[in-house]
Amino acid sequence: MKNSIIFLLSLLYIQTFAQVKSSDTQTIIEKEKNAFVQKMNVGNINPNTLNYDLRYQRMDLTVNPSVYHVSGSVTSHFIPNQSISSIYFDLTPQLTVSQVSYHGNSLNFQQLPSNEVKVDFTAALPSSTLDSLTIHYSGAPAVGYNAFSVDTQNSTAILSTLSEPYGAQDWFPTKQSLNDKIERFDIKITAPAQYNVASNGTLMSETLLPGSQKLTFWRTQYPMAAYLAAIAITNYTKLNDVIGSPPFPFVNYIYPSTAADPAAMANIEWTKQAMTTFETYFGAYPFRNEKYGHMQFQFGGGMEHQTMSSMGGFTKQLIAHELAHQWFGDKVTCGAWNDIWLNEGFATFGEHLVNEKLIMTNTQFMNYLIGQKNFITSSPGGSVYVADANLASVNTIFNGRLSYAKGG
């Protein structure tokens, strides 16, 4: 009888554990699905941006987490791959361009209803020659897409961005191509001095300005797809630590309430174990010269912004999923959204890996895998590749059975 009770309790534990894991996975999927669904009217590639290579961008923006507005400029360095007399950038019309500067002069431009800015040069630019221009703009970004959001956390204002897949154009002019990563990105944000600004790469400086403002300068020198650029701003507690072997910076910008939560802090510390495991099996963390870390934001789930994941919470599964994306999704990025299983499948595999090595017993893990297999085979057919005809179906792209479970 005693053994029977223990066996039944074990089954109950495994079932409960599996339900928790399933709930966590569904939260991750719903986050990514909701981010994508608002922007499905855009295709994989804007053909008007294929005639140049975007090499560098510098954003100089002024924002306030209490105000739904952005103003400033973005400087872009590019190399035409053919002679061009005009250049296009992705930018939604809710943002108003006031000027395009080019070597001290102003250029003519048009804002098009196709979410583009067309800039006309006074003379054709030659192929294979580095050039640059600056777009000055301002406005209230498109509402409802979560690409640019202001809200509150614990009664304090917070601003965050979440650009996957096509939301970068909602808050800055860029080239939204998965095949043309931006080699270097400088992110300069002016905001009220009481807030801390989190972003990609290395923190270069924080400078107090007149009028109780602060300029925060982040720089990343690793190639990055436009949708992986992000900022988040609130009264963060900043935690500077190290991770990995040999160690590199582990930087967390979290709410003060999270810093006072022992369970959340223990899981953030657990990230170090996940990093060691992933480096053992995936190879060196791909952005070691800068950092890894988390910036907390007001949405459920998370987002694998390069070098600094945005996190709605700190469960171990979510931490592992977003960390695995740094290898698969950020360093190695699918060339088209048809192949999103390459991002999500490998991130799901990362969850499996920490379940096996760090979280579960052998029995728990085998039962977990059986559950995954049963889920994958619960319906007939299904390809991890999303055909062009299904790119308008967010439920097909973010299919938990195929893109996540079967992909993993």
Q: Where do the PLM segments sit?
A:
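Glycine/proline-rich low-complexity spacer/linker segments in large multi-domain proteins
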Residues: P47, H136-F185
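Hydrophobic helix-coil surface modules that form long, contiguous segments used
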Residues: G72, S163-E164, Q176-A320, F349
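Acidic/His/Gly-enriched intrinsically disordered linker/tail segments
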Residues: E344, T348-G408
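Bacterial Sec-dependent N-terminal signal peptides
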Residues: M1-Q26
